[in-house]
Amino acid sequence: MKRALLFVVASSFALAACNSSTSQNAAQEQKQGGDVGIQTSWMDKSVKPGDDFFSYADGSWVKNTAIPADRSRIGGFFIADLEREKNTKELFDNIIKANPTSGTDALIANYYNAYLNTDAIDKAGLAPAKADLDAINAITNKQQLSSAIGGTLRSDTDPLNATNFQTENLFGVFVTQGLATPGEQLPYLMQGGIGLPERDYYLSSDPKMADTRNKYKAYIQTILQAAGYPDAQGAAARIMALETKIAQAHEPIEQSQDFKNGAQVWTRQQLEQKAPGIDWTALLNAAGLGSAQKFDAYHFAAIPKLSALVGSEPIQSWKDWLTFHTLNQRANVLPKAFRDASFAFNGTVLAGTPQQRPRDALALNATSGALQDAVGKAYVDKYFPASSKAQIQTMVDNLKAAFARRVQAIGWMSPSTKQEALKKVQGIVVGVGYPDSWRDYAGLQIVGDNAYANQKNVALWEYRHQIAKIGKPMDRHEWWMPPQLVNAVNLPVQNALNFPAAILVNPFFDPNADAAFNYGAIGATIGHEISHSFDTGGALFDAVGAMRNWWTPADFKNFQAQADALANQFDQYEALPGLHVNGKQTLNENIADVAGLGAAYEAYKASLGGKPAPVINGLTGDQRFFLAYAQSWAVKSRPETLRRIVLTNEHAPEQFRAQSVRNIDAWYQAFGVQPGQKLYLAPDRRVKIWG
């Protein structure tokens, strides 16, 4: 349920991403407008708000903003990330100057320096990977193959919090409370094994997909040739054939998003009986799961098919596959030929980005991602004031109260269901800025001269941390995002929310800004995350995160009718010629957008204490609220990236999320929207999920 990010630029960090005229206008407007927050220079007033509210709010910005050559898209995440990068670079510069020899600062310095030093990486060649490649080459039977596959498993998927279903390893592992075992933490087994983003990239007859497949096959061959692999062309063909079979075994994304589908618990014996082909003892022992007796078979239909492929496909094909993915996953810390080939395919073919980012920026982000708590603690100590934490906590409380009022006012919901919903709202655990406790990095080996080993060690260390939770009580206060990430998340089995520090700044939140701006921007984000607790997935969990039915049949039928109407609404949006948004695939995010926006608006009105909002720069309070929301979704994407989002992501493209205002009655009144305008919906067709 990862929240896609907002986009409201009101700071000088926009200079790096916008052309000079847009930047100068925004800076001047910020100076003149004080702390209003709305960028009127972004607006295209030639567009009627009732025809296209995204273009009305953001049209001039879209026309005048160029996507940087080293980016696949530009938007709120990237603008805010410029500040996050600036702050993190300052932190790292100070740490490295101190030349630390121990503690987390030494880990940060060593990881960063090793990643940055491409001369050393190039000089080392494939020596750091030799042991891994030799082990694959030595495989001669299915037991050894199963062990090798098990040794690659990592905690690199997350179906519940991040809706991340993709891993190059044959299976993904995720550890939390089991969907069918409240109070008991289990390892989830998930489908994996493909290098392209999603199964449709292999199976679609679309000519663009066929072209991508051809380029992927050529990329595989390039990587293997760079490694001196024998018969790289033949191996690439075998890998492509194997991955196509793996993709055919995969469950589609809509099925992956259905939590009820992922609630099957298999014992160790059932796993072996239901999914023959793999030597499960060898695989689980190598994966550190040899003592696990229960598994959440999240992709229960795919697991037997993937296991069968291990039993039926030639060992050589699997050795080819293991070799390629070992190199592909670590290409960024291998010699230049690997780095360049990886960017040419993953960066340019898949995302449309023409230019790679500077190595120091890549090193900074890689270090921040690898040592999340070490960097995060230093980050919040310096850049996140206690006053911001307190103000956001107050906004969260106001949003929760608004959501509760909206639940109480629903006419179609029975008292028993309302009682459960209110109990769930009241029980939400909210984390603002950073976690209550930090990871202990004792035992993690990070050196200053082996970036490949560092990357491997961090992934293994994180995996061992996750599987150590098996059988232990769930911590409802556990964080699933680092503080230095510009994002927010709802955690369904914890009934909890995380709002990292990096999103709680301009352009998302300004402690001195007009209430209309803050509630339209970060307030809608807070409302979105609260509302995820009541989307088609979140509504399956109760106040303590147990998956159980707390709805009456009639109530859920009414709820589903509203959800279906919203799915149909989004099905109509065309992202690229012939490529429409999938309303079912994006439904939970769309529900959270609509319900969260409604709750944020109600909380904003309550914050006025019965007083009228002032008119500022010719804009009423309601107009500023809705413009802040729409400007939070300002975005410009390369076509390749937009296609990938539509096909693989649970979020609709931002330009369509901005149009969610059409379901809010107050928006019609604020902008005089009339029948006949393109976004107009008759009152009985406006989706009213949760109020």
Positions of PLM-derived features:
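Positively charged n-region of N-terminal signal peptides that target proteins for export
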Residues: 1-4
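C-terminal motif of bacterial Sec signal peptides marking the signal peptidase cleavage site
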Residues: 15-17
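Bacterial signal peptide processing site
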Residues: 19-21
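N-terminal low-complexity, Pro/Thr/Ser-rich intrinsically disordered segments
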Residues: 24-39, 43
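Active-site-surrounding "flap" and adjacent substrate/cofactor-binding loops of secreted or lumenal enzymes
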Residues: 31-34, 45-123
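Short, solvent-exposed loop/turn elements at domain surfaces
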Residues: 61-65, 196-197, 507
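Intrinsically disordered, low-complexity linker/terminal regions across diverse proteins
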Residues: 81, 274-277, 296-300, 361-364, ...
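Noncatalytic, helix-rich "gating/capping" subdomain that lines the substrate-entry/channel surface
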Residues: 95-398
